Amino acid sequence: MRASPTSPPEQVVVDASAMVDLLARTSDRCSAVRARLARTAMHAPAHFDAEVLSALGRMQRAGALTVAYVDAALEELRQVPVTRHGLSSLLAGAWSRRDTLRLTDALYVELAETAGLVLLTTDERLARAWPSAHAIG
């Protein structure tokens, strides 16, 4: 019996909001994010890790996560297969979007646009500001 050929994973840009929901497991969106990211090849701008770190730190300071939990989440983040892309080639395009997007969000949008990939987010504000983004959850 021959195995059926498998299709290559879908290439996507994932933003920090989706990864935080996945790692923190504190929102109802965690399962939706996990399901949507299954069998994808993820890409993100290089500032992705800093944004995830900042969000997890805010959650810990607010009492939603323990220090030990954040430590474990950061280890999990280190192991997530996300291809990080340098920022220098994205800066001008992100800057051109300054009137409609937060500049950190514009870096994700610019990467998705220039690479021709879908942007996945759980950030409702980003999804409203850039309708081509696919909101999860």
UniProtKB/Swiss-Prot annotation:
It is an enzyme of class 3 (hydrolase). Pfam families: PIN. It comes from the Bacteria. Mg(2+) binds at D15, D105. One of its GO terms (biological process) is positive regulation of growth. Its EC number is 3.1.-.-. Keywords: Hydrolase, Magnesium, Metal-binding, Nuclease, Toxin-antitoxin system. SUPFAM superfamilies: PIN domain-like. Residues 12-129 form the PINc domain. One of its GO terms (molecular function) is magnesium ion binding. InterPro entries: PIN-like_dom_sf (IPR029060), PIN_dom (IPR002716), PIN_Pae0151-like (IPR044153), TypeII_TA_RNase_PINc/VapC (IPR051619), VapC_family (IPR022907). Induction: Induced during infection of mouse macrophages. Induced in persister cells in response to D-cycloserine. Belongs to the PINc/VapC protein family. Toxic component of a type II toxin-antitoxin (TA) system. An RNase. Upon expression in M.smegmatis inhibits colony formation. Its toxic effect is neutralized by coexpression with cognate antitoxin VapB3. This is Ribonuclease VapC3. It comes from Mycobacterium tuberculosis (strain ATCC 25618 / H37Rv).
